[in-house]
From Swiss-Prot:
InterPro entries assigned to the protein according to its UniProt record, in alphabetical order: CinA, CinA-like_C, CinA_C, CinA_KH, Competence-induced_CinA, MoaB/Mog-like_dom_sf, MoaB/Mog_dom
CDD domains listed in its UniProt record: cinA (cd00885)
HAMAP family: CinA_B
Protein source organism: Bacillus cereus (strain AH820)
NCBIfam families per UniProt: cinA_nterm, molyb_syn, PncC_domain, PRK00549.1
The protein, known as: Putative competence-damage inducible protein
Lineage: Bacteria, Bacillati, Bacillota, Bacilli, Bacillales
Length: 412
């Protein structure tokens, strides 16, 4: 079954609020085998909403509306759909009683326009609103399914989970949708796609969807099957084929992130970390401390932006700063080794480079060195040539730090 989500509200068109409902619904619908092929946003206008309904009826089996169920004159969704389907609006007695009780409890006047929220399409299945006033509803008519939901996410989401999804399962084939996201770092989207292009071209079940975001690449693998275990087997087979080719860049699944994976390995191996940050100015340390319980592995850091701090606090030799420069492999090595010693950690990591927009020390923006000093291991410096804005270069440098830390910890 194919669905279209129609979000109603002028505030969405004006960009005053984000349409988070559509994202939530698309994910939930996909999980029960309903394909969402279109998202539509329309303002609080009867004529344009009617046009949107007519277009959606031509291309979708299910029309899901969010918003426009409230008490004001610009809440037009129910009235417009009722007119389109030649259906009457009738009061739902349970909803009316619930709304009336709310006004009595709060000592407010129960005005006529608030009764409007209890109106539903005649013959519809009514979805109780446990977190608000206006109920939702579902109606199967003329071979189409119409779902009307409130606009506020705090009302819509629990309504969907409790009442709407069980209703929608009556219209699905019983197939389960199983998805797994593979996360990669250190390889561009185009490079990764070339390595798995034949798998993407030949995809049927499961499907493979690449996405690049914040310097990372993900592959979403999605399989359909009536049996969840069989769907997982389909996913696993394709995952194995992918990792045979690009496994060196793989680091995690779904909502696993680089900094969490690195911290997890530090804890597992009982190692402590210290950082020396010039280029990143504390970004790396800030992300480290986003993980709960990190004090057991993170000693601290030094923001060594000025060369005086590099020289007098972290003891980078003056001749290195004068000859090689602060943005150099040698400087990164000294910073990593010396912050490790200074803070008595097992591992020291350093960041030095040019964020831009101008060149520095005759080195172009994006020139970056990440140093990694681990006890009983030779110090390694990773040269990077990054692109992007000043902030993007700094953020990507921190990510590369987590990536190289994670990969090195996997080896030892």
């Amino acid at each position: 079954m194919n669905a279209e989500i129609i979000a109603v509200g002028t505030e969405l068109l004006l960009g005053q609020i984000a349409n988070t409902n559509a994202q939530f619904l698309s994910e939930k619908l996909a999980s029960i085998g309903i394909n969402v092929y279109y998202h539509t946003v329309v303002g609080d206008n009867n004529k344009r909403l009617q046009q949107a309904i007519e277009v959606a009826e031509e291309r979708a089996d299910m029309l899901i509306f969010t918003g426009g169920l409230g008490p004001t004159k610009d809440d037009l969704t129910k009235e417009t759909i009722a007119s389109s389907l030649a259906e009457e609006l009738v009061y739902d007695e349970k909803a009316l009683a619930s709304i009336s009780d709310y006004f009595k409890r709060t000592g407010r006047e129960f005005t006529e326009n608030n009764k409007k929220q209890a109106l539903v399409l005649d013959g519809a299945t009514v979805f109780a609103n446990d977190h608000g006033m206006a109920p939702g509803m579902g109606l199967n008519k003329n071979g189409k399914v119409y779902i009307l939901l409130p606009g506020p996410p705090k009302e819509m989401k629990p309504m969907y989970v409790s009442y709407v999804e069980p209703f929608l399962r009556n219209f699905t084939t019983g197939e389960n949708i199983y998805s797994r996201v593979l996360r990669f770092f250190g390889i561009g989207e185009s490079q990764l796609e070339v390595k798995v292009q034949d798998l993407i071209d030949g995809q049927t079940n499961p499907t493979i969807a690449p996405l690049a975001n914040d310097g990372e690449v993900t592959l979403r693998l999605t399989a359909k099957h009536q049996n969840v275990d069989e769907a997982e087997k389909l996913i696993q087979h394709v995952e194995d084929l992918i990792l045979e080719r690009v496994g060196e860049f793989f680091y995690g699944y779904d909502q696993e992130f680089l900094h969490d994976k690195a911290i997890e390995l530090l804890k597992k191996k009982g190692l402590t970390l210290a950082c020396a940050e010039s280029l990143t100015g504390g970004l790396f340390g800030n992300q480290v401390t986003e993980s709960a319980g990190v004090s057991s592995v993170f000693k601290g850091g030094v923001i060594c932006y000025h060369n005086d701090v590099k020289q007098h606090v972290l003891h980078v030799p003056e001749e290195v700063l004068f000859t090689d420069g602060a943005v150099s492999k040698e400087c990164a090595r000294y910073l990593a080794e010396n912050v490790k010693e200074l803070l008595e950690a097992d591992i020291g990591i350093s960041f030095t480079g040019v964020a831009g927009p101008d060149a520095s020390e005759h080195k172009e923006p994006g020139t970056v060195f990440v140093g990694l000093a681990i006890k009983d291991e030779p110090t390694v410096v990773f040269p990077l040539n990054l692109s992007g804005s000043r902030q993007q270069i700094r953020e990507r440098s921190a990510k590369y730090g987590f990536y190289h830390l994670y990969k090195k910890l996997e080896e030892i």
